[in-house]
Design a protein with these regions (language model features):
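Short secondary-structure transition hinges
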Residues: 49, 88-128, 161
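Hydrophobic/aromatic residues within well-ordered alpha-helical segments
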Residues: 47, 54, 58, 62, ...
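C-terminal peripheral helix-coil segments that are non-catalytic and often amphipathic
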Residues: 85-88, 92, 124, 128-132, ...
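Helix-turn-helix
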Residues: 7, 11-49, 53
Length: 191
């Protein structure tokens, strides 16, 4: 991707995050880039191209955060590191993360199918961490990994609405982790 195309995608992501995909026009993007509307079409075929590229960037960033987790780490540490990575992506790529969470519905056809598949694959990777924790007895034996993954992702995905610049995302992730996972660990009850 050329430098200009990358700048264009970043600017579109910023506007999509602020105004929504449908609230952003090609004219808005051109104005933000300081170019004529028609000149954008030398770089893109449609506004949806920019939405797709933003979505692709988001999917790649979230998957890369999971890829960085050491395979030999204990399962609960992997969950903590996944949460840290997710919040770090949100903090470092706020516009992209916002668009990835909110605007994916506006893609059409094969592009939508691809991004939905990437989102599902990410969710499955998170579920697998909880499944591993349960199977290794690091988490409760009756843990529903689907519910656990949805809870974690529901909390983490909305970070774009409240995360303040400069906040330590690892500290926030560790607090979330303590609240979420401590209730999922095994416990003993009196006989």
């Amino acid at each position: 991707m050329s430098t200009r195309r990358r700048e264009l995608t970043r600017e579109a992501a910023r506007l999509f995050a602020q105004k929504g995909y449908h609230g952003t026009s090609i004219g808005d993007i051109a104005e933000a880039m300081g170019v004529q509307k028609g000149s954008l079409y030398a770089h893109i075929a449609s506004k949806e191209d920019l939405l797709y590229e933003t979505m692709r960037e988001g999917a790649d960033a979230f998957h890369a955060a999971l890829d960085a987790i050491p395979e030999n780490a204990p399962a609960v540490d992997k969950i903590r590191l996944a949460l840290r990575g997710h919040l770090r992506v949100v903090a470092e790529q706020l516009d992209v993360a916002t668009v990835f969470v909110q605007e994916w519905r506006y893609l059409e056809g094969a592009r939508r199918d691809e991004i939905v598949a990437e989102r599902r694959r990410y969710e499955e990777r998170i579920r697998e961490l909880f499944r591993e924790g349960r199977e290794l007895s690091e988490l409760r034996a009756d843990l529903d990994e689907t519910a656990a993954a949805l809870l974690l992702l529901s909390a983490a995905n909305w970070a774009y609405t409240w995360l303040q610049p400069g906040r330590d995302t690892d500290e926030i992730a560790d607090r979330f982790f303590a609240l979420l996972v401590d209730g999922m660990r095994g416990y003993s009850t009196p006989a």
